[in-house]
């Protein structure tokens, strides 16, 4: 079964984004995301790969208690000005489960196989 995705479109006007700049794209809708879910705004692959545009914060997060208009902050990674046309699909929204946790401050942690090994500590193959 093909999964449906919500494509986010600019609704108002054409917007030109200069190289190295960010513009907030107003899409003209607000959502009531159910409690326990979060909305994640991702780049559309064509916008990023072909035109150099991607969400400025890499992944936009829409909490379930947010009720305002959804906007996408698009950053121009290319070396030239790029125009986003009115109605153009600019991003995609994915709903995902969201788990909250209560953390407790501790003086020590349980040992693990990995331990304190950070970046690159698990090998490359």
Positions of the model-derived regions?
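Glycine-rich active-site loops that engage anionic ligands at enzyme catalytic sites
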Residues: 24-82, 91-97
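Short, small-residue-biased leader/transition segments that mark boundaries at the very start
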Residues: 1-8
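Catalytic strand-loop segment that frames the active site of acyl-thioester-processing enzymes
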Residues: 5, 13-17
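Solvent-exposed alpha-helices and their adjacent loops that cap or buttress functional pockets
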Residues: 16-17, 62-66, 111
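Helix-rich terminal scaffold detector
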Residues: 89, 99-125
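Short loop segments at secondary-structure junctions
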Residues: 14, 77-79, 124
């Amino acid at each position: 079964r093909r999964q449906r995705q919500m494509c986010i479109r600019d609704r108002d006007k054409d917007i030109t984004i200069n190289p190295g700049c960010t513009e907030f794209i107003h899409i003209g809708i607000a959502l009531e995301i159910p409690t326990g879910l979060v909305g994640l705004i991702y780049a559309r692959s064509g916008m990023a790969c072909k035109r150099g545009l991607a969400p400025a914060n890499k992944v936009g997060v829409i909490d379930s208690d947010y009720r305002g208009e959804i906007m996408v902050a698009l950053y121009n990674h290319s070396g030239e000005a790029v125009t986003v046309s009115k109605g153009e699909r600019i991003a995609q929204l994915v709903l995902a489960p969201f788990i909250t946790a209560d953390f407790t401050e501790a003086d020590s942690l349980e040992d693990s196989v990995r331990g304190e090994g950070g970046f690159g500590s698990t090998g490359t193959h």
